[in-house]
Amino acid sequence: MDLLGKKVLVAGCGKSGLGAAGLLQKAGAVPVLFDENEKLDGKALCAREDYPKDTALVLGSLPKELLSELSLAVLSPGISIEEAFVSTLEEADIPVWGEIELAWNYEKGKVLAITGTNGKTTTTTLVGEILKRYQDNTFVVGNIGTPYTQEVLKTDKDSVTVAEISSFQLETAVHFHPTVSAILNITPDHLNRHHTMENYAAVKESITKNQTKDDFCVLNHEDSWLKAFAPKCPAQVIWFSSKEKLERGYYLVGSKICRNLGNGEEVLLDVDEMQLIGVHNFENVMAAIAIAAAYGVPMETILDTVKHFQAVEHRIEYVATKNGVVYYNDSKGTNPDAAIQAIRAMKWPTVLIGGGYDKQNTYDEWIEAFDGKVKLLVLIGQTREKIAECAKKHGMENIVLADSFEEAMDICVRAACPGDAVLLSPACASWGMFPNYEVRGKMFKEYVNSLKG
């Protein structure tokens, strides 16, 4: 869509919204920032360095006269398409996009796009590192931290963009067309937004909707949702599996990552050569290898990068050993399935901090995965009573409810003995206690690093 000189509403005044407005302004459109929160400090917002100069700001409700002037509306990922003002826009026949669709409108190169409930950040970061070693004009964007809108005007016909894409971002993607897509897994999450697993799965699968048989889609062979989806996938499917030797795809045999693409089995590397730990990370690595290889990166470059790649911040991140106790930060474990992977990676009796914002998930499988490994469960946040009841139902008795994060940390330090681990892996979002999981993880690390020993 040609937006030169057109007025575009950008809903949401966070990092994504400001990035979208900045892109529109640079591209010659006229952005108008909008937020329903009429109590937002507009003066402070407009004073931010990343606030697009001279951009109009509307707080509260949408003026009717503005509606008639708009050519497009762009929603930030945190804004649901079910919001009342979105219906107002649609009734006025104003197209509604998200930031991913807006960026795609200006994309000149190829895109490798990664989604899934868990593993997105690690996989995207690893693919980004591989591609950066392969070619200079590589951009790593999306849900990972740098908005796609911030980088897209730097792309050209030879560039590649590696994008981490969330379900919230896919909801408002219309023409987005990655050359290689990947869906790492689909497990319960964000059901407070998507309502049903069927809806959630459909949104994740929509990353492929504009792909063709000339494109590739990397899928997890162990995921029942993805097995059911594969026959409908418009792209060429490349499987990976941590449990089964595949006739075609990437798979784990003992400690060896192998592939067979129709020309016989090839051993690629031993997981002991990697810095990452845990089966979930072996899956992430297989997906990353498959994505990069499908794009055309030589295997030697891929494997050398994999061997030197370290865990991303806040995802089963080793922090320190204090007085014989190891501390791990898994603040990015914001749902039960992600937190299960962290528990499985622990090799020690574990004091676990869990709980946070309630996304309407269930916690039975998470509690069952403790398998006697969790010696004490310290619970915080909105879900603490809900999780405590679930844990008691499964026969767990060593449970403490803390009133604050600091109190939870104090309890953990007192309870942990030499040879134990203290793990922050909440299985819940951070909202309510923290602005995001990064702040939660940083607070954990600051506390640990302040300990003597």
Pin down the residues of each PLM region.
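C-terminal helical cap/extension that packs against the catalytic core
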Residues: K43-T55, D364-D420
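Nucleotide phosphate-binding/pyrophosphate-handling subdomain across enzymes
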Residues: D2-K7, G17-A27, V271-V374
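Phosphate-binding loop of NTP-binding sites
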Residues: G22-K26, K64-S68, P77-H221, W225-P234, ...
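N-terminal leader/targeting and accessory segments in enzymes
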Residues: M1-G98, L102
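Residue-level signal for inorganic ion chemistry
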Residues: G12, L24, A73, I114, ...
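Residues in the short beta-alpha loop(s) of Rossmann-like NAD(P)-binding domains
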Residues: G14, N37, I144, E222-D223, ...
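Short internal beta-strands
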Residues: V32-N37, C217-H221, I353-G354, K373-Q382
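Beta-strand->loop->alpha-helix junctions that form or flank phosphate-binding loops
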Residues: D35, G60-S61, W97-E101, V141, ...
